[in-house]
């Protein structure tokens, strides 16, 4: 599913958490994704070589932590 991570109104927080979790990412990398989850996963996969499933799992954990 192509979820827009900006709809939560927390895109800046999400970007910060993603950059902490995957230190090789830049603001430009994340801005290129336009907040689209599938694009975020793609950029992380491209930069790190992690599997999409592993990235999705970690991203879910980060998003869940932001909701608390």
State the predicted function of each range.
Residues 1-68:
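Intrinsically disordered, low-complexity, hydrophilic segments
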């Amino acid at each position: 599913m192509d979820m827009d991570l900006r709809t939560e109104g927390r895109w800046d927080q999400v970007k910060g958490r993603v950059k902490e979790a995957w230190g090789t990412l830049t603001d430009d990398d994340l801005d290129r994704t336009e907040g689209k989850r599938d694009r975020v996963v793609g950029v992380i996969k491209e930069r790190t070589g992690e599997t999409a499933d592993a990235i999705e799992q970690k991203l879910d954990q980060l998003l869940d932590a932001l909701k608390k």
